[in-house]
């Protein structure tokens, strides 16, 4: 898998930071950056990686994208049709996680079901938040903040970061949760690169 220069810059930023925001315009290949990082992580040894998407359909699509490159056991934590082992019962999630301890594991979930992984109490090595502007919603922020604190590595991918200027509402400008912007690719740069 060959990365374009801006994707390699993003991958290097991820390798140098345990948490942060990766801002790349739509169509810029954010998913490939996450996949390449996941491949590198899994080559190091047994890892648990979580991929969070805003919708079940996107979780399934991301699963197929990751599965093409990453050798790992797959679990889906959401309420939709999965085609893989899955469910939202925290005990079942923890049992699956423990049962597959000799393998790399990737868990695909949605923002709506992320709290079920929190309740399962599993150790997460890396978590990727796709379309991370969704993570600031009040129904999701508790689980997002939990994994921001307890996952070893935590990355927020978006084309459109959502900031807040009021203390009553969480925004991606809260670096204690979302980290700093570790890579920002302007749209004209993508056009330059073709």
Predicted feature locations:
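Conserved pre-motif I regulatory segment
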Residues: 1-23
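Walker A/P-loop
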Residues: 17-37
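Conserved Walker A/P-loop ATP-binding site and its immediately adjacent core
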Residues: 31-36, 42, 46-68, 163
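Loop/turn-to-beta-strand initiation segments
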Residues: 47-48, 102-106, 124-126, 150-156
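Conserved helix-turn-beta segment of the N-terminal RecA-like "Helicase ATP-binding" lobe
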Residues: 57-91
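Conserved motor-coupling elements within RecA-like helicase/translocase cores
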Residues: 84-107
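Conserved RecA-like ASCE ATPase "motif II neighborhood" in helicase/translocase motors
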Residues: 101-143
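Post-DEXD/H (motif II) to motif III coupling segment of the RecA-like Helicase ATP-binding lobe
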Residues: 133-193
């Amino acid at each position: 898998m060959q990365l374009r220069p801006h994707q390699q810059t993003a991958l290097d930023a991820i390798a140098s930071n345990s948490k942060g925001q990766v801002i790349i315009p739509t169509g810029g290949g954010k998913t490939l950056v996450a996949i390449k990082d996941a491949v590198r992580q899994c080559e190091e040894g047994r890892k648990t990686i979580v991929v969070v998407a805003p919708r079940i359909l996107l979780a399934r699509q991301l699963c197929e994208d990751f599965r093409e490159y990453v050798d790992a056991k797959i679990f889906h934590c959401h309420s939709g049709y999965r085609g893989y082992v899955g469910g939202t019962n925290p005990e079942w999630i923890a049992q699956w996680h423990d049962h597959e301890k000799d393998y790399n594991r990737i868990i695909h979930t949605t923002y709506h079901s992320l709290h079920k992984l929190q309740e399962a109490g599993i150790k997460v090595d890396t978590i990727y938040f796709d379309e991370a502007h969704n993570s600031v919603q009040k129904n999701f922020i508790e689980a997002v903040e939990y994994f921001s604190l307890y996952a070893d590595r935590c990355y927020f991918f978006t084309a459109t970061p959502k900031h807040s200027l009021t203390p009553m509402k969480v925004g991606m400008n809260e670096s204690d949760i979302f980290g700093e912007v570790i890579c920002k690719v302007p749209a004209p740069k993508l056009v330059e690169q073709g």
